[in-house]
Design a protein with these regions (language model features):
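Alpha-helical elements of Rossmann-like donor-binding domains used by nucleotide-donor carbohydrate transfer enzymes
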Residues: 15-22, 39, 99, 103
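Conserved acetyl-CoA-binding loop-helix of GNAT-fold acetyltransferases
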Residues: 87, 93-106
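Conserved beta-strand in the GNAT
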Residues: 55, 61-69
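Conserved GNAT-fold acetyl-CoA-binding loop/helix
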Residues: 20-43
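A conserved beta-turn-beta hairpin within the catalytic core of GNAT-like acetyltransferases
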Residues: 72-82, 92
């Protein structure tokens, strides 16, 4: 099955939140996720976006994400922090995580 890696869009945030919740369940912290789809949209797409997100998509389904945000290093200047890299369990082992990480490295 082929996948594409692309910049996330506002209408992807429902799927992004679902993957965040899947990660929290894996980490045995499902009740710790309090962010909402609306908050992700507000924080990622309006004013000064607080994060950048790439998605992996198979047949119009978001199956992975890389979520990153800017930070500043006193030694190196502008940098990006990779907060989460998540691939849904069903699609692991197909190189999707590596492709998302590679997109992050190439972009920043």
């Amino acid at each position: 099955m082929d996948y594409i890696i692309r910049d996330a869009k506002k209408n992807d945030m429902k799927s992004v939140l679902k993957l965040i919740q899947e990660l929290a369940l894996f980490e045995r912290e499902p009740d710790e996720v309090i962010i909402t789809e609306d908050q992700l949209i507000k924080d990622g797409f309006y004013g000064h976006p607080k994060f950048k997100c790439f998605v992996a998509e198979i047949e119009s389904e978001v199956v992975g994400i890389a979520l990153l945000y800017p930070r500043y290093s006193t030694w190196k200047g502008h940098a990006m922090h990779l907060e989460d890299l998540i691939v849904t369990e069903k699609h692991r082992g197909k190189g999707i995580g590596f492709a998302l990480f590679s997109k992050f490295i190439k972009r920043f």
